[in-house]
């Protein structure tokens, strides 16, 4: 890395980052005091962020509201929402902003050099020169504002952050995590809610909000990060000339103060809301939490990641199993959290009872004492190290650029030591150290010091309370009524005028001359050719093998699929249960805890799932697969496949005790998943009213699946024999050679060895049954239900769905563009900006299945009516060449997300299973790049046909759904 003519910067360190095959650079901008860290390498997926240390001084949510609002226009880019303009019109591979308890970061990523520079420019201008000082209208809709429609109407509060946090404060898991931080750090920033407490957000004044930005959004408080293949010197010069050189360093103390250690543990009991139908028994959360050292202790940082696995995280881990065996809670979670300056280790029993608190604590102490006395299981320690190291080496973060994850990890040390941004991103020497310590008593010493004899601890109990949300709403209504009574007639008229003015402001589009200031690529900057499919058809005996040949860095990725499209409808939820038990029960050679260790020592993971693949050219047909996934180093493949054989063929499903534990744990985890993804649950349910594909997904992972799991949990003793018989029969029916097909990602040189292992597995499956070669789908009766599912949330998830193919329409690439237009224009403006919902999504599948859904939405009927307005919006849709190009670029950005080998293989295999070839994918891309606004208008009737079906499903606040019960055919409790 050549650094010339950079007198504006002081080079603090330049060093090789060998583990990342990169070069590291640490700088300080001399004039402004800005900190800069660079990881330079040949990765074209470039990453930039600027972050600030933003310690919250109260729980009004000011750091969070600023994060939302600085991206609502700036000096150089004065449009109302540059963030949305970039989403619609850039080739970004990541674009967002994130608020943490003590920091806020603004990251972007792109593989296109020009686009990357454009993104950097908009973000730098946003954080340093935001329009929040010019327009109070920016603060109100994103943060909070009072609304008054008429003199006789009640005053209400609305705001995107306000509603987002109302949703967060309805979740037991979120409430618990918040109280854990409050309990352990009463004297520093972690005791405050940086996201905002809905009861405190209304207290934030516009002046305090601006003051927070003035204080903390200065270069001397900034952390600037660059990653990837770029001209680093050119980027540094640009930052200096355009922004940093305009500032003088100032005295600013934003350091996070360490919490003084406790002399003895503290105890806290709090409440969280449940619906009127949910039981208070078995719904308490018990937690024991400890502050574990210092984030700048590099060895401790990873050592506790390993102890997390060995003590708590692994199936059958001693803390988890002892608490389950003692009858305390249905699921034991927690572990090591390194997101704070002083990391935290938590042990949490979910679905427990307050009366078990002393037993909970005594069991923990007993287990920890035994671990120190008898020693931690060495295999468990090795498995924990191997699993952590495999994740580190593979660096597979899904759709997130790995450079972004490295950058966030830099802040784990950099935020507290200006000279140490790379402390935790270089880790291989620490893994070697930890392996050497397995037999030395090192880990036992850590347990003794930090978990057994550590007074800086807390016991946090959160108990359920029916009607808590109703109480909160009643208190808020009284507070707002009192506020209204305190206003003079003139003030009431002014509030009505302010409400009207804000709505007018929200409806006014940004001037075209301002929109033109947002930098944008041209259509010719986009690649015309679609990404290839990597499907080479091969055979292993009579079994089809789809080989996705590519460089995979010595890792083999296998998907073993079993065609179960002929599965009886009544058995579908049991398929969902089967995927959760395989790998988590005893087998012929291993106890389930030993099995987990073997999997983590020899592989990067073995997992089971169900896959639904509707055929894109035969709407009535689809593939339904039971899938087993394995990833492993090529050298470990024989051991990995032997473990897979062991799981498939010898799992002891008849172990009633273990099966009981899994069912209880599964119920708890499905409920937690529902709380975090109500939009997905609602949209899947709405689709299941008419779509076979969605019905199968819903039956194996949605509300129908949950209802079976809950019933089994409550009546296990009566139903266990039938459950075991059903699962054992299913295993013998599914795992036969005739059903099997294999997807393999590996290099050509490794394929022969892979094929030998496939042959090994085929020989060890259950004997062939008489199976009709062309397995047919069973008869299925689908019906509209239009359900409302009531829960303890303070917000709603409103879903509408339908299928356009049933009405004679066919898929077109313009639907990809419509997703961008809906998500960031029509739905964004009406559901989020005006309505106050945190999010809104839409999807148009090739088989015709379509949905619209809102996320953490204060509204219900209003949102449903907004959906009905889409055809009218499309009928009048107009976009000039620049605007249309913007939508197309945003669409291509979504289509061209960089993929690792595993993701490329998955994309290719999905295409194969759905009957898609490269010509189909290229046709879609051509339609996208060549689209006009006329093509978008042409979708009006297609969308109208979907909405005319009137398929509705809503998950949300009990009182809100009851008050609008006429919208539903059925009103139910989500949990009982």
Model segments located where?
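Non-catalytic terminal extensions that flank enzyme cores
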Residues: 1-47
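M16 family metallopeptidases and their MPP-like homologs
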Residues: 45-55, 81-129, 136-148, 174-199, ...
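Extended, regular secondary-structure scaffolds
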Residues: 211, 223, 232-251, 374, ...
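Active-site His/Glu-centered metal-binding helix of metallohydrolases
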Residues: 62, 66-70, 578
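Non-catalytic, conformational "gating/processing" segments within enzyme and secreted inhibitor domains
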Residues: 158, 210-242, 723-758, 948
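His/Glu-based metal-binding/catalytic segments typifying zinc-dependent metallopeptidases
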Residues: 40-42, 49-51, 162, 166, ...
């Amino acid at each position: 890395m050549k650094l010339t003519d950079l007198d504006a910067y002081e080079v603090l360190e330049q060093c090789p980052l060998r583990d990342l095959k990169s070069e590291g650079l640490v700088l300080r901008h001399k004039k402004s005091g800005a900190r800069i860290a660079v990881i330079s390498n040949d990765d074209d997926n470039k990453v930039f962020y600027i972050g600030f240390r933003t310690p919250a001084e109260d729980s009004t949510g000011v750091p969070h509201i600023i994060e939302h609002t600085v991206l609502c226009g700036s000096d150089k880019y004065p449009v109302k929402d540059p963030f949305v303009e970039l989403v619609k019109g850039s080739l970004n591979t990541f674009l967002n902003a994130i608020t943490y308890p003590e920091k806020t970061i603004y990251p972007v990523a792109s593989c296109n050099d020009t686009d990357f520079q454009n993104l950097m420019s908009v973000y730098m201008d946003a954080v340093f020169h935001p329009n929040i000082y010019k327009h109070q209208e920016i603060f109100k809709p994103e943060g909070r504002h009072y609304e008054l429609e008429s003199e006789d109407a009640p005053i209400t509060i609305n705001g995107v952050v306000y509603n987002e946090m109302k949703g967060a404060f309805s979740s037991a898991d979120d409430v618990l995590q918040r109280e854990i931080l409050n309990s352990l750090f009463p004297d520093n920033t972690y005791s405050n809610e940086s996201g905002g407490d809905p009861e405190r957000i209304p207290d934030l004044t516009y002046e305090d909000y601006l003051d927070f930005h003035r204080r903390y959004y200065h270069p001397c408080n900034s952390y600037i990060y660059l990653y990837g293949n770029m001209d680093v010197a050119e980027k540094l010069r640009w930052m200096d000339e355009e922004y940093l050189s305009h500032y003088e360093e100032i005295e600013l103390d934003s350091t996070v103060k360490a919490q003084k250690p406790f002399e003895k543990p503290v105890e806290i009991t709090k409440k969280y809301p449940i619906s009127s139908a949910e039981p208070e028994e078995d719904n308490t959360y018990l937690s024991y939490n400890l502050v574990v050292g210092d984030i700048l202790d590099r060895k401790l940082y990873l050592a506790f990641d390993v102890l997390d696995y060995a003590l708590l995280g692994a199936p059958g881990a001693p803390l988890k199993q002892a608490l389950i065996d003692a009858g305390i809670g249905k699921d034991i979670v927690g572990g090591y959290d390194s997101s704070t300056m002083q990391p935290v280790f938590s042990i949490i029993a979910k679905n427990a009872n307050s009366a078990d608190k002393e037993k909970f604590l005594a069991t923990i102490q007993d287990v920890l004492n035994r671990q120190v006395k008898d020693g931690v299981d060495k295999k468990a320690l090795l498995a924990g190290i191997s699993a952590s190291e495999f994740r580190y080496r593979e660096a597979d973060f899904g759709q997130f650029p790995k450079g972004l994850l490295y950058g966030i990890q830099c802040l784990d040390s950099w935020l507290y030591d200006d000279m140490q941004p790379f402390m935790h991103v270089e880790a291989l020497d620490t893994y070697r150290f930890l392996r050497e310590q397995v037999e030395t008593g090192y880990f036992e010493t850590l347990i003794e010091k930090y978990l057994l004899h550590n007074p800086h601890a807390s016991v946090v109990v959160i108990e359920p309370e029916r009607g808590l949300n109703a109480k909160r709403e009643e208190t808020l209504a009284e507070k707002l009524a009192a506020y209204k009574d305190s206003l003079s007639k003139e003030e009431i008229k002014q509030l009505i005028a302010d409400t009207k003015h804000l709505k007018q402001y929200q409806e006014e589009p940004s001037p075209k001359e301002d929109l033109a200031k947002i930098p944008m690529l041209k259509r010719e900057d986009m690649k015309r050719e679609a990404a290839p499919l990597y499907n080479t058809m091969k055979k292993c005996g009579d079994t089809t093998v789809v080989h996705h040949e590519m460089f995979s860095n010595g890792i083999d990725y296998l998907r073993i699929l079993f065609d179960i499209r002929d599965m009886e409808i009544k058995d579908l939820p049991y398929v969902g249960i089967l995927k959760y038990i395989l790998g988590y029960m005893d087998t012929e050679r291993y106890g389930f805890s030993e099995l987990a260790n073997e999997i983590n020592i020899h592989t990067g993971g073995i997992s089971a799932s169900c896959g639904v693949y509707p055929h894109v050219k035969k709407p009535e047909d689809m593939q339904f697969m039971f899938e087993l996934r394995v990833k492993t180093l090529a050298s470990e493949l024989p051991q990995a496949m032997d473990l897979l054989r062991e799981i498939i063929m010898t799992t002891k499903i008849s172990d009633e005790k273990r099966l009981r534990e899994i069912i209880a744990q599964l119920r708890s985890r499905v409920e937690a998943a529902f709380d975090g993804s109500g939009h997905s649950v609602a949209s899947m349910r709405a689709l299941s009213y008419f779509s076979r594909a969605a019905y199968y997904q819903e039956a194996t992972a949605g509300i129908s699946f949950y209802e079976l799991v809950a019933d089994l949990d409550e009546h296990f003793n009566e139903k266990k024999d039938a459950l075991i018989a059903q699962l054992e029969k299913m295993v013998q029916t599914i795992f036969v050679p005739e059903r099997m097909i294999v997807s393999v990602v590996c290099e050509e040189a490794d394929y022969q060895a892979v094929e030998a292992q496939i042959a090994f597995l085929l020989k060890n499956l259950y004997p062939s049954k008489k199976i009709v070669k062309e397995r047919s789908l069973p008869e299925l009766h689908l019906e509209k239900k239009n359900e409302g599912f009531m829960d303890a949330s303070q917000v709603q998830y409103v879903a509408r769905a339908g299928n356009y193919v049933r009405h004679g329409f066919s898929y077109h690439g313009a639907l990809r563009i419509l997703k961008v237009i809906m998500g960031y224009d029509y739905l964004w403006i009406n559901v989020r900006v005006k309505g106050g919902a945190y999010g809104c999504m839409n999807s148009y599948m090739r088989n015709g299945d379509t949905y619209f859904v809102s996320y953490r939405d204060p509204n219900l009927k209003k949102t449903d009516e907004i959906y009905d307005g889409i055809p009218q919006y499309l009928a009048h849709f107009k976009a000039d060449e620049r605007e249309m190009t913007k939508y197309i670029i945003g669409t291509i950005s979504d289509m061209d997300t960089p993929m690792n080998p595993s993701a490329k293989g998955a994309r290719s295999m999905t295409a194969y299973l759905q009957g898609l070839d490269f010509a189909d994918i290229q046709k879609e891309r051509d339609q996208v790049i060549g689209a006009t606004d006329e093509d978008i208008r042409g979708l009006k009737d297609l969308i109208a046909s979907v909405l005319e079906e009137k398929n509705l499903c809503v998950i949300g606040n009990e009182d809100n759904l009851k008050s609008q019960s006429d919208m539903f055919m059925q009103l139910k409790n989500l949990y009982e």
